[in-house]
Amino acid sequence: MWLPVYVPLLLVFGVSLSLPQGSLGTDSSSLRGVDADTEKRINVGKKHLQTLRNLETRCHDSLQALVVIDAGSSSTRTNVFLAKTRSCPNKGRSIDPDSIQLIGAGKRFAGLRVVLEEWLDTYAGKDWESRPVDARLLFQYVPQMHEGAKKLMQLLEEDTVAILDSQLNEKQKVQVKALGIPVMLCSTAGVRDFHEWYRDALFVLLRHLINNPSPAHGYKFFTNPFWTRPITGAEEGLFAFITLNHLSRRLGEDPARCMIDEYGVKQCRNDLAGVVEVGGASAQIVFPLQEGTVLPSSVRAVNLQRERLLPERYPSADVVSVSFMQLGMASSAGLFLKELCSNDEFLQGGICSNPCLFKGFQQSCSAGEVEVRPDGSASVNEDVRKNRLKPLATYCSVNNPEISFKVTNEMQCRENSIDPTKPLAERMKIENCSIIKGTGNFDKCVSQVESILVAPKLPLPANIEAASSGFESVDQVFRFASSTAPMIVTGGGMLAAINTLKDHRLLRSDFSGDVEELAEAAREFCSSEVIIRTDGPVIQLPNARGEQKLNSLNFDLCKTMALTVSLLRHMAAGENQPSFIKWEKSIAGPDGKPLADLGWQVGVILHHVLFTEEWGRNAYEAGYSHNL
């Protein structure tokens, strides 16, 4: 490019060729001899240029979708969130954490454990759980594992697209498609104890499939090894903890929580709440510690900033986070039956008397899933995969290196009446037991839940992670550490137990965790008898308190009530007690509508997006285009 010879001369003499930024040209006072219409058009042009100049320097907001796929113990399910992003010149793009909202939850599809077990059934052969398998030989069948993963991902992708298409308007779709859609697929306790290389291989395949979506719908899904992976029990609990405190506005950069100390250092207090989350296969307990708390040397606290769960700009907090396998609703039910009905105190003449079941209820002696029929009889599913002892019995195998090479792990299995040397069917079987009958003795139910699940002599099997954090059982958690922070209990079964007692006016509507009040209410409820009506079986409550239909969801609700009583007693026995305890499914926003369900899903999003520079590199600099 060349310039006329007079241009340098103009520059030498300080003549500027650029227009002044404020006025964009000569001001109106110099426009002598110009008529009013011309001057008006000049001003319109100047204003138009100024508007465009402002657009170049201001921040721009747009919407982005985020997908969290919950690969839980019983199913795999998509959760689609929408968030506001802001892009500023020279600063990059970031997500407003307060804007994150759930716009749709998808259908439930097969769990990852089912995908792996079906693949092993086919290529390792039936009864692979009962004999040695050379895992190295199975590498030749990775392409077939890929096909199984592809079938699942196609269902999840179609379901996600259906949610996006139905929940977004056309303008929002344009923005969402342009930015790309980060996907976080995390497995929890369902495959946490799966041994060999199979689980990690499945995740390599899942990430590849997410990064290569169908081009037909126009949505650009993408992920990476940080976002799509198995998460530990402690992580699951910490993400649930972050979710709770974010949604309830306890977590934030609020200046009112901060002060400058005598040394000129900024100190921020936290007003965080703890959470007890009970899922299908595991339970998580997480709570913040008071400043100055002294823990035994064997107990490991987690600092949210040091462990990079939250950025430094958030108030610092040390928390206890522990996860127990075999304490979820399904897994604990299987283990509890196995132990209870192997005890001579409760097993007489082939009949197991279960104090946690209603009087008049009976079923065959198995840990299989139960269906309560209209005639009041209970049908037990004989499918091996529907047996609630299956995951534990698979883990407790002499063919699992965690058992064969670690004597303490084998002892834990044997302590729970599972012989690792026996075939899978025998490991799941309850010896010498044919029928289980309910007795409705709640106090005895509590004592058995306490001794089998909450305070066992040896750690429950597959709890290496919990033991490594310093806790071998739930009772030890509140003995070694405690907190005055509020505690929120969540999980479908735990909520159902409390809400059922409230519905029958056995608990006050504002019940806040008084353990003796709960024990008295549950004692009355669980002494009910099963009565067969023309429209099906009901629980006849004493003292004319009414009836409750008996079904597959509430027939063993008293065990959950007993677990809750035991948990509350241990909380109350700690050095510090929670300021209050609540049972919640979700947190409502200012409009009274739920922002999102409690659980780990929102927490895992926040864990990534709050580190704005790292998120910017992964989600925007690399983003979907990284996979092109």
Curated annotation (Swiss-Prot):
The keyword Heme does not apply. Keywords: Glycoprotein, Hydrolase, Secreted, Signal. InterPro entries: GDA1_CD39_NTPase, NTPase_alveloata. Glycans are attached at residue 432. Its EC number is 3.6.1.15. Residues 1-25 form the signal peptide. PROSITE patterns: GDA1_CD39_NTPASE. It is found in: Secreted; Parasitophorous vacuole. The active site is at 236 (proton acceptor). Its main location: secreted. GO terms for molecular function: nucleoside diphosphate phosphatase activity; ribonucleoside triphosphate phosphatase activity. Gene3D superfamilies: 3.30.420.530, 3.30.420.540. One of its GO terms (biological process) is nucleoside diphosphate catabolic process. PANTHER family: ADENOSINE/GUANOSINE DIPHOSPHATASE, GUANOSINE-DIPHOSPHATASE. May perform an important processing step in the conversion of high energy nucleotides prior to uptake by the parasite and may contribute to intracellular survival and virulence. NTPAse-I has a specific activity 4.5-fold higher than NTPAse-II in hydrolysis of ATP. The primary difference between these isozymes lies in their ability to hydrolyze nucleoside triphosphate versus diphosphate substrates. While NTPAse-II hydrolyzes ATP to ADP and ADP to AMP at almost the same rate, NTPAse-I hydrolyzes ADP to AMP at a much slower rate (0.7% of the rate for ATP). Homotetramer. Belongs to the GDA1/CD39 NTPase family. This is Nucleoside-triphosphatase 1. It comes from Toxoplasma gondii. The lineage of its organism: Eukaryota, Sar, Alveolata, Apicomplexa, Conoidasida.
